[in-house]
Amino acid sequence: MSDGDADPAAASPSPSTSTSSTSASGAPPVPASGPLSSGPLSSVPAQVRRTVAGATAAPADAELTVVVLAPTDPMTRGQLRRMADLARDEGYRVRWEEARGGPTAPFATIGGLSGLLRRADRVVMGDPFSRYVQLLLTITRARDLVVVDDGTATMEFVAQLARGERLVRWHRKGGRPGPRDLLFAPVSSSARRRLTPSARRRVEVFSSMPVHETPDGVTVTANDFSWTRARFGPPRITKGADMVGTSLVETGVVDGDSYLEAVRTLAKAHGTTRYFAHRRESTEKLHRLAKETGLEIVRPDLPLELIARRGPIGRTILSFPSTVVHTLPLALAGTGVRVAVCDIDPTWLTENASPRAQGFLSGVTGTARDVHRLTSVSLA
């Protein structure tokens, strides 16, 4: 149940939980009646924003609690603190749980949330691959389950659910399950069953990511970022270009030297001056990038979609395959900002990369270009 750093499935950097009853266009629908309690949201600060975005349409008398299962990573903790403040400013109750504060912390957290989860009519969750989230799912009796993770993992989650497969992150290697996987298998299987619609349970996915394989009975609601656009901006647009970083090196998918060369080449070709670091990028790698490319490294204290809406932001935003090639065009719609994506060359992949990595990453950029008409960027 505790997060092992070597286990990406368990180490979701900021599982947070939320209870929200949300409705209207671009947001999960409100249940007909009944109070709302809390449920597992999950890993990224942006998921708090998505929950708040959907919750703005909830009935005035709905009881809504956002529960943050605090991570240990300082960068993600900082972003979550800011997002928690934003949720409070919007009028929602926020409960901060030090869920990873020692060997007994998970037991205290689960015990403290059990009553809330059992009473919940609706549970809104983020990363369904998180073992913490899967464990909390076994407690709730909610009739409505909503997944609000707009990350690329959403695409894989929905596809695996449709095919009846076990939930495995795309960047993890295949093969036989390890001892921890076998130990946790009953919980994971239970969570997968609960995320399968039935006569007693409705399941919805609230996401801006493209969903091509929809499981029977699952409702897919598009997040068009209308709340983000209404709440922030419009931004001041600068003449230069900005680049969005990725943690593909940290997750063992892309070779570090190849990534550095790609960043250097793109920055020189497009006059890039700033590099918005992913919250999981290592300090050592960022120092090297700054030294060898001359880029200004920016560590955002809010999700990038909010940073971009607040501005200033470059007229061109360069990115590698990631969630932002889908979300930034929505958040910045009507501003004239161009989002350009550089595919990952197969030669950049490490020997430890999952066999599925190249196909999955190509799918992320390919669907984004089709949907949002992004401009592809290739290295000379």
Tell me what each language-model feature is.
Residues 43-47, 72-75, 129-132, 152-154, ...:
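Short acidic, S/G/P-rich loop/turn micro-motifs used as interaction or catalytic elements
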Residues 241-281:
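Conserved catalytic-core segment of nucleotide-activated headgroup transferases in glycan assembly
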Residues 4-42, 369-380:
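Actinobacteria-biased recognition of intrinsically disordered, low-complexity terminal regions
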